[in-house]
Amino acid sequence: MKRIFALLLGVLFLVGCSSSQPKAPLAGKYKFEGISYTHVQHHEPTKFFYQSPKMVEKKYNKQILGALTKENLLDPNSSDELKIKITHRREFIGEATFAKSDRMGNIYLTYEVEVVRNGEVLRHYSSSELRFNPGVFGNLKGLVGQNNDDSLENKAISANVKEIVDTIKGMK
């Protein structure tokens, strides 16, 4: 009987420790001023020219603002502010070898989303590094070294924006 009582007491203790505090409710619409952008690139191409990091940042800002507006998630007078940090990494074929290529291999994304009210972080999400999947034909194009323009990167930006906005919509 003592063992059962001790076991029951232990289980109740562990259940009590595992419960979390209730989260403060969000306003549902957010104030958004723009992203914090970091561009990572370990190789500077000389044969092909790609869009500048400033252009990539502008595209992210424009598309995120458009998607948030479309989803009716923006309110400039909201008490909740949306802070988004994006790290966009370009990978070039062979960049880690002696046989570097100026053809783009892929795009990687890491992002953080915070909802802040009066300086207090109410929600925080941080992704691991995500690789853009251009599909079967896009991967084949990369394998044969045909990614020498901005099309791969523009598709990656659009897909990444969708991922970020879906994360924001999922924050409750």
Task: Kindly give the residue locations of the regions a language model identified.
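Sterically constrained small-residue positions within well-ordered secondary structures
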Residues: 8, 23-28, 75, 102-104
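Surface-exposed short loop/turn segments
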Residues: 71, 76-147
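Extracytoplasmic/periplasmic, Sec-exported soluble proteins
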Residues: 52-56, 60, 105-107, 145-156
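Sec-dependent bacterial lipoprotein signal peptides
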Residues: 1-19
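Bimodal feature
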Residues: 63, 121-122, 161
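Short glycine-/small-residue-rich flexible loop motifs, especially phosphate/cofactor-binding loops
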Residues: 9, 65, 112
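A structural "domain/chain start" motif
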Residues: 15-71, 167-172
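C-terminal/domain-edge helix-coil "capping" segments
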Residues: 22-25, 70-72, 132-172
